[in-house]
Amino acid sequence: MLEIENKYWSKGLKYVAGIDEAGRGPLAGPVIAACVIFKKGDRIEEIKDSKKLTDKKRNELFKIIYKKALGVGIGIVHESKIDEINILKATFLAMNKSIGQLSVNPEHILVDGPYSNVKIYPVEHVVNGDNLSQSIAAASIIAKV
């Protein structure tokens, strides 16, 4: 599940981040985005799309991800702001907030889905990314827990 990250690591990049969000489905509640960076080649076998994991497994992996990741950022946009700007803009805002919370500046960002408004770093949009990228899958777990 590191093939996409490997593409950038093999070009000499060290800090490849994955972003995913949770909370776009509920009628009420915040949208939460997470951004995760792993050390080159650092693989966690059990990581996969958070929707395919039990609550117990997500909680276990949450702790492992925080322990092993070089950086984890979380962005939250609350209901009042969602009502003000709409869910799509709120999702993009949460993504950008999560990047701003990282302790390490990414050199490239993998975003789950076909589009985003992330402009400060180079981006690859990965449809179904939480099944294809460990960094995105880890972000989906962090955002969901």
Predicted regions and their residues:
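RNase H-like, Mg2+-dependent phosphodiesterase core
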Residues: M1-V145
